[in-house]
Regions:
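Short, basic, alpha-helical segments at the C-terminal edge of helix-turn-helix-like DNA-binding modules
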Residues: 52-62, 100-116
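A short, glycine-centered helix-capping/turn motif at helix boundaries
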Residues: 31, 67-69
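Basic/polar phosphate-binding segments, predominantly the helix-turn-helix DNA-binding elements
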Residues: 7-58, 75-100
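Residue-level recognition of oxygen-bearing side chains
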Residues: 69-70, 85
Length: 117
């Protein structure tokens, strides 16, 4: 493993809502933008900003599925400036708008009935 790439991944996971750029991420981990981009893509299989976009979608999907926060709140938590921008990116990634996806997930996985174990 590469400690710089590992640190970059940790930062993206810890602070997905930060307005990351490849320059800022490189500064944080002590690499030039080109060195970080090359190492990250080689080890992870995708460039850092693409990884961040995918991570934001994964985290957003988990928050939609497991919580009751509004789509606007989730959008901010995962780094989008607006609910509309998050909704567009989510639909492009998942194939459904966030609210429709959330409803479908809840129908597909109803809560357990703990009264009748």
């Amino acid at each position: 493993r590469d400690r710089h790439v590992g640190r970059a991944i940790a930062l993206l996971h810890e602070r997905p809502a930060d307005p990351w750029t490849i320059d800022e991420l490189g500064r944080q981990v002590g690499l030039s933008r080109s060195a970080l981009h090359e190492r990250f893509a080689q080890l992870v299989g995708q460039p850092p900003m693409q990884y961040l976009a995918n991570w934001r979608m994964q985290r957003g999907a988990r928050l939609l599925r497991e919580g009751n926060a509004t789509v606007a709140t989730i959008a901010q938590e995962v780094g989008y400036d607006s609910e509309a921008a998050f909704a567009r990116a989510f639909k492009r990634s998942v194939g459904q708008p966030p609210a429709a996806w959330r409803r479908a997930q809840r129908v597909a996985t109803p809560p357990l009935d703990v009264r009748n174990p």
